[in-house]
């Protein structure tokens, strides 16, 4: 999986 900043990624808490 690629590590890119996204509104969805922040939702997971990164």
Curated annotation (Swiss-Prot):
Keyword annotations of the record: Cytoplasm, Transferase
Keyword Nucleotide-binding: no
Cellular compartments annotated: Cytoplasm
Gene Ontology CC terms, in alphabetical order: cytoplasm
Chain's role: Conjugation of reduced glutathione to a wide number of exogenous and endogenous hydrophobic electrophiles.
Subunit annotation: Monomer and homodimer.
Name of the protein this chain belongs to: Glutathione S-transferase
Species assigned in the record: Pseudomonas putida (Arthrobacter siderocapsulatus)
